Swiss-Prot record:
GO terms for cellular component: cytoplasm. One of its GO terms (biological process) is ribosome disassembly. Belongs to the TRAFAC class translation factor GTPase superfamily. Classic translation factor GTPase family. EF-G/EF-2 subfamily. It is found in: Cytoplasm. One of its GO terms (molecular function) is translation elongation factor activity. Residues 9-293 form the tr-type G domain. This is Elongation factor G. CDD domains: EF-G, EFG_III, EFG_mtEFG1_IV, EFG_mtEFG_C, EFG_mtEFG_II. It comes from Bifidobacterium longum (strain NCC 2705). GTP binds at residues 18-25, 90-94, 144-147. Catalyzes the GTP-dependent ribosomal translocation step during translation elongation. During this step, the ribosome changes from the pre-translocational (PRE) to the post-translocational (POST) state as the newly formed A-site-bound peptidyl-tRNA and P-site-bound deacylated tRNA move to the P and E sites, respectively. Catalyzes the coordinated movement of the two tRNA molecules, the mRNA and conformational changes in the ribosome. SMART domains: EFG_C, EFG_IV. It holds the Pfam family EFG_IV.
């Protein structure tokens, strides 16, 4: 069985988060090496990192899924006896995979935010920082790539203050920079750690005096650190006023208190790739990030009654409660369910309740994961992260709990997809497998959706960006052996009428020997307000028995059938109120079929006179952009026939709300990124259907007619 520490005080559940290419996965690889979890270092650029185990991750050098592992660490800078268990989740940095970050942060107690020492805070750094704010996750910061040309520690610290609105507490100063970066000054211990290159892979470093050229600066920053720590509580402030200084233990206690309260963020620095600075940062993880005991009790509610609040504490004596934060598919074990256990404990073979779905589930096996390797466990206890096997109907965001003491924990919310692509299988064999593959992939990723277009019959896959959908198609090919073609889906246009046509008559009469066909109808067709979601209304105003009741239904069915294909471009017609006012029937020749045909033809003859128009889907678009790009973003939205609704201030950004036709939004994600250097982000959702301008309408009609 895998090793596990029983005292929760010595457990840390952390995530590694950053903008893409800040060195997040490389930092994680060094952590695994120095903690003894890995015996060799896998490099991202070689496609060999432990945590990026998917083929697509190794080829592209990016993290796509959040991977979990557990390692152990004893401090090196002070108090070296205690051994800590660190459960780590390495999350993606690419904007297309923000859902992976979102669901990881939901179950973590703390995080390490990795920044590029040259760039400082980058766009996706801002995004993941806001996500961590949303879930109240305390963070320490690691300014990485201090060996990089142009690296500037002090600039990077300033960007954390200015762009994130955060309060940084500098815990270290770099010794040298770029090629001359050799180590760090510890501002608590007031000593230097230098990696001289004689020890392989930076596993050992020398503890020395602070270099002469840094002594004054180190003293200045030490005093700032002491003053910041003293702000943590009244006792520390009194000690500071009495003595003019604080002990090392008091400094750490004050910084820890501020960090857990999310009032400040300790700053460390190094170069993970050059094997410098990672061990002191690990000391910072155990010194300043919370244990499960430091986090408030998880709140939930009684299933079916949100007014009854329930607390669960991270102790084995409380009833079992866990949150499912990720699902993945294993070639041998099938569905792997990743959970954070908040209270109680379970063993393999136990039955639990999925309170979200009100279904019982049985736990087959319990693992702790090391990337894609499974380490068996004989139990799952409060405060830790595990993987369960054997659960059938569970999905991301579900609560698992004790059957006799049910609770439902707050789930997770994910953004709606912003881009969709049509896929079609290449062969009949692929067609049969494609449905299974897509349903499994959709189960793994909450932002990936699969739908079928009712008009075209196309299978549409939707997600957060083109890269995400490319990966999905690639995974279908590799993992499920499904070959498919990708295309662009057509916008789902509609038609409607703008003018009422009254007393439209139609007589259906056919005599071919034997019983004939006869039906006569008189109808009104009027525009119908569709804002309440109603697209069609039918009313019967026939009096005097001119049309038998049995024929009214077929008239309605005939009108509906005719509305499936509009007169302008063959799009479905919406927004029509049809009223049958009079008519005539024959005692022998009238039939349901005759009246259905009469209703259908009556609408077809009325529609051209009713001022038909084409409608297009209008999207509600929100763009968050740094102020310097606002003019360009607004100009671009106007060119896309957008209608700006409002402009407001967000945290360090401008928020633009607009309504834009869906047809103009294809490719927008790439254009927006290029116009704003990747610093803006947007979301969109369906708002309404609106009339297409005449010039655009003419182009659509020509395209539909193949002209």
């Amino acid at each position: 069985m895998a090793e596990e520490i029983s005292d929760l005080h010595d457990v840390r559940n952390i995530g590694i988060m950053a903008h893409i290419d800040a060195g997040k996965t490389t930092t994680t690889e060094r952590i695994l090496f120095y903690t003894g979890k890995n015996y060799k270092i896998g490099e991202t650029h070689d496609g060999a990192s432990t945590m990026d185990f998917m083929a697509q991750e190794q080829e592209r050098g990016i993290t796509i899924q959040s991977a979990a592992t557990t390692c152990f660490w004893s401090r090196q800078s002070h108090d070296t006896k205690d051994k800590f268990q660190i459960n780590i989740i390495d999350t993606p940095g690419h904007v297309d995979f923000t859902a992976e970050v979102e669901r990881s942060l939901r179950v973590l107690d703390g995080a390490v935010a990795v920044f590029d020492g040259k760039e400082g805070v980058e766009p996706q750094s801002e995004t993941v920082w806001r996500q961590a704010d949303k879930y109240g996750v305390p963070r320490i910061c690691f300014i990485n790539k201090m060996d990089k040309l142009g690296a500037n520690f002090y600039y990077s610290v300033d960007t954390i203050k200015e762009k994130l609105g955060a309060t940084p507490i500098v815990m270290q100063l770099p010794i040298g920079s770029e090629n001359d970066f050799t180590g760090v000054v510890d501002l608590v211990e007031m000593q230097a750690y230098v990696w001289n290159g004689t020890e392989e892979l930076g596993a050992k470093y020398d503890t020395t005096e602070i270099p002469d050229d840094l002594k004054d600066k180190a003293q200045e920053y030490h005093e700032k650190l002491v003053e910041a720590a003293a702000e943590a509580d009244d006792d520390l402030m009194n000690k500071f006023f009495e003595d003019g200084d604080l002990s090392k233990e008091d400094i750490r206690a004050g910084v820890r208190k501020l960090t857990i309260a999310k009032e400040a963020f300790p700053i460390f620095c190094g170069s993970a790739f050059k094997d410098k600075g990672v061990q002191p940062m690990l000391d910072g993880v155990v010194d300043y990030l919370p244990s499960p005991e430091d986090v408030p009790a998880i709140k939930g509610y009684k299933p079916g009654d949100e007014s009854v609040e329930i607390d669960r504490h991270p102790v084995k004596s409380d009833p079992f409660a866990a949150l499912v934060f990720k699902i993945s598919t294993h070639p041998f074990y099938g569905k792997l369910v990743f959970v954070r256990v908040y209270s109680g404990s379970v063993v393999p073979g136990d039955s639990v309740l999925d309170s979200t779905r009100e279904k019982k589930e049985r736990i087959g096996k319990i693992f702790q994961m090391h990337a894609d390797k499974e380490n068996p466990m004989d139990r799952a206890d409060a405060g830790n992260i595990y993987t369960f096997v054997g659960l059938k109907n569970v999905t991301t965001g579900d609560t698992l709990c004790a059957i006799d003491d049910p609770i439902t924990l707050d789930s997770m919310t994910f953004p709606d997809p912003v881009i969709q692509v049509a896929v079609e299988p290449k062969t009949k064999a692929d067609q049969e497998k494609m449905g299974i593959a897509l349903s499994k992939l959709a189960e793994e990723d909450p932002t990936f959706q699969v739908t079928t277009d009712e008009e075209s019959g196309q299978t549409l896959i939707a997600g957060m960006g083109e890269l995400q959908l490319d990966i999905i198609v690639d995974r279908m090919r590799r993992e499920f052996k499904v070959e498919c073609n990708q295309g662009k889906p057509q916008v789902a246009y509609r038609e409607t009428i703008r003018k009422a046509v009254m007393d439209q008559g139609y007589t259906h009469k056919k005599q071919t020997g034997g019983s004939g066909q006869f039906a006569k109808v008189l109808m009104n067709f009027e525009p119908l307000d569709t804002t309440e979601g109603k697209t069609f209304e039918f009313e019967n105003k026939v009096t005097g028995g001119h049309i038998s009741a049995e024929f009214i239904g077929p008239i309605e069915a005939g009108v509906k059938e005719a509305m499936e294909s509009g007169v302008l471009a063959g799009f479905p017609v919406v927004g029509v109120k049809a009223t049958v006012t009079d008519g005539q029937m024959h005692p022998v020749d009238s039939s349901e079929m005759a009246f259905k045909l009469a209703g259908s033809m009556c609408f077809k003859e009325a529609a051209p006179k009713a001022k038909p128009v084409i409608l297009e889907p209008i999207m509600k678009v929100e763009v968050r952009t740094p102020e310097e790009y606002m003019g360009e973003v607004i100009g671009d939205l106007n060119q896309r026939r957008g209608n700006i609704q409002s402009m407001t201030d967000g945290v360090g950004v401008k928020v633009i709300d607009a309504k834009v036709p869906l047809s103009e939004m294809f490719g927008y994600i790439g254009d927006l990124r290029s116009k704003t250097q990747g610093r803006a982000m947007f979301t969109m959702e369906m708002d309404s259907y609106d009339e297409v301008p005449k010039s655009v309408s003419e182009e659509i009609i020509k395209a539909q007619r193949g002209e």
